[in-house]
Amino acid sequence: MAITIGTQAQTLFPSKGAKNVCVDTHLVLTFTGDAPQTTNHGMVRVFEVQSGACIDSLDLSIPAGPTASRTYGPECDYTKLPYDYHRTSIPTNRTVRPGTPSGGALPTYTTPADYQLNIIGGFTDAFHFYPIITRGNTATIYLHNNVLEYGKEYRIAIDSDVFENFEGTDNWTFTTKASAPDGQTLRVNPGGTADFCTVQGALDAIPDFSTTPYIINIAEGDYEELVYARNKSNLRIKGAGMEKTRVHYANCEVFNPHPLNLKTNEYPGTFPSRRAAFMLDNCQDIIMEDIRVETTMQGQAEGLLVNGERIALRKVHIIGSGDAMQGNGTIYMEQCEMDGGGDSFLGRGSIFLYRCNLRNDGGPFTWVRNTQGHHGDVFVECTFSTTNGRKVDFGRSPSNKGKTYPHAEQVMISCKTAECIPEGWSAIGEPTTFFAEYNTRDLSTGQPVDTSKRHRYARQLDGQKDKTLIKQYSTPSYVLGGWNPQF
């Protein structure tokens, strides 16, 4: 449906009068020329036609989120309080005020509102988000998650001052699908021809801790959305290919920081981080494959955050900044690609990577923080290289503001490297750690690398003397607490 607003012809999605619309749809306006600039003024409102009630509104005068780092007081420290993941129902923007605190945190909301807030995946502390994103000739309006319901007609009203040279509209209507899908295979397509338009919409449709296996098939396309999955299990998330299905968002620690009164990312099972583009939190028995997940923000900004057990990734391309991926739990990765900055891989769990390619722009690839009784990061037949010729290193495990990691473990078996420092590792804080390698070769020549100047706490494994140890660390089930990943 094409209409004229201001001086530019515009196409609406969903089209005016459309039926069978996904309940997680975005509102997309496509112009003949570049999309007009947003003005940081005006309102977007959604009305339920039958009742006349306004069921959602976006105030464009409220900034999306912070653009500068917070200042924290001395009372803000890493919490050791176990986070309570139990819930009898999934909170949404329709039932709970966004910013309602959990896990001992202070409220995220303020009165009047400092920033936009959106409950995603039932996380009531909420996320800052961009209510409108423009790309080229397209403007996408992001409603609050889970405000639309099945089998209802809605009317969209957009004030004239939301965009420059815009006359506004208040007669854009559409009707959602009659009911939710009833099968265990859910389809996602951004064009609205499947069960859901977004990855998050499909995740929200799956019960917590499901004992029934589910599959989410994500069609080829570009999905610009912040994804947070909590309490999911027995789930396969499958895209159309690493470079065909792209899920991305501009998120980082500055934009979605930890609460004012507590820090995150130190003790497993405590208050979750909100800074990644794609988050699997308190999840078990998940397979992700044939997909690209990416943060487009700089700083402490993971493309993927995993808190969970028995999480398997195959042919997943992860792109981030500092800490490109954070992994806590038991994680298996095969034929994956990773691009990031220093500390590309931050982890407190047991992680086994097989035939993966890791690239960064200089500095350490890992910061290993596994605890006693758990294996750390193990790389088998992986490659390590740099994108700009700067020197890289395998990783580090220094003290962190007084905290040390005496049981940190990183093992490299038959890996290939380029532009790696002679020491291999840049910082190993304790002699009790286990940082070892076997058969490391040059990525370009295939020849063995010179290990004569390796870090004093690093260990070279011998093919004969350490034969059993090498075999053990080459076996996923040994590293992952008995779990043998299957795709």
Feature-to-residue mapping (PLM):
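Acidic, low-complexity Ser/Thr/Gly/Pro-rich repeat segments typical of extracellular/periplasmic
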Residues: 5-180
